[in-house]
Structures are given as C-alpha cells and as structure tokens.
Amino acid sequence: MISEAVNNKKWSFINWKLVRKVVLGLIILGVILYFNARTPEKTSAVLSSTLRYAVPLILGALCGIFCERAGIVNIGIEGQMLLSAFLSYMTNVWTGNLLLSLLVGMLTGAIMGLFLAFLSIKLKLNQTIGGTVINILATGITGYFYQTGLTTQGKLWNIPLGPLAKIPLIGPVLFNNPPITYIAILLVIFSQVLLFHTRWGLRTRAVGEHPRAADTVGVDVFKIRYWNVIIGGVMAGLAGSFLTLEGVGMFERG
C-alpha cells in the first residue's frame, strides 16, 4: 500500500489530459507531414479549404460561447447569420463596397442580438422560443425580399502576409487568406484572453453561473447579458458576411 501511494505521488504532477492532447496533436501533425511529403500542393490546398470552411462555424461557436457564458441560450445563431448574409449580399449588389457590406452584416447581427436580448431579458420570454422567433423571422424576410438574377461586385481577396506566406505548408494555410479568416483566428485568441484573464470575463462567467451572487456583489447582470448577446450577434453577423463576401460570393434562399 505504501509503495503504491509513493508511486501515485511520483506521477501525480503530470497533467495526463494535457499529455493526451499533445500526443494526439503529434499524431495529426505526423499524418499531415506524411501527406505533405507526398503531395505538398494538394495538402496545402486541402488544409486551406478546411480552415476557410471552418470560419463560419468558428464565429458561430464564439457567438454561442459569449451568450452561454452570460446565461443566455442562443439558438437563433443560424437566423442571425442568414439575415446578415442576405443584407451583406444586397449591400454588395447595390453599392459594390465590400467594407460597407461587411459592416452592414456585423450591424445586422448586433441588432438581431439586441432583439434576442430584449426578448429574453426584458420580456423574460423563453430563450428557446426567442431563438426560434429569430430563425423564422430571418427565413421569412430573406425569402420575401430575395430577387434572382442579381450580381455582386466581387468578393474579398486574399491578403498574403509577406514572407510568412512563403513558409512551406503553413504559409499558404495560415498567412494567405482573406480578411474575415484572419479576424476569425484572432477572435479565438482574443476571446480566450477576454473571458478567462480579464475582470469583464470574470463578471461574465459569474453572471452566467450564479447571477444572484453576481448581483449581490454589485455586478449589473442585465447590462452584462445585453452586451454579451450583442457581441455574440456581431460575431454571428461576421459569419454571415463571410458566406456572401468571402465564401461562396452569392446568396440563395434558406
């Protein structure tokens, strides 16, 4: 028994969960390097496509994280993305200004987030019902106002980051992308720091986990929730803008 306890103590300092993640990462890296050695151009193309197709999923997930951490269940992310994609597309058709189209998409997501927050916080509507309302509303609006035969003025282009884009394998994947892809990568890092290493993040998590306790120590629960849902809406709007400004470059009903 004593020897067993000593052995357990000997290895107790090792974070086995981290070890498993590192081993899995090394295995994946080994597979990638193997295929890269055989067909480097094809491997880079596949990894680049994988990253770009993941962008709306990343941004949608971040939207959900910001809402959930504040105690709001947001199942209206798809509706926020849909309406943002539509208005970004129409702005691009009417003006040809890609930056304005991107801002319109983000603003649309923010407004839809504010609407969800109003339903859930002010009116105390069931959050699942509120998200369903947004999804149905977005589907109805885009289906009614959509017109066929419209053409956009182009898509967002790749921005290579100098010498970094020439690094074998990872250069074309990470450092030669359109702007929204870069923004999505940076937002993942920024969100991690914001939620777990700032006072605002601590308050957000407190509001989501125990709102009464947070209110007792003077945290404005409603304000935190409003801001988080709006910020999440901006990210959903960015995801929608990606679909029509950087991804497929067009819009279809639904």
Residue ranges and their predicted role:
Residues 50, 54-61, 82, 105, ...:
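Small-residue faces within membrane-embedded alpha-helices
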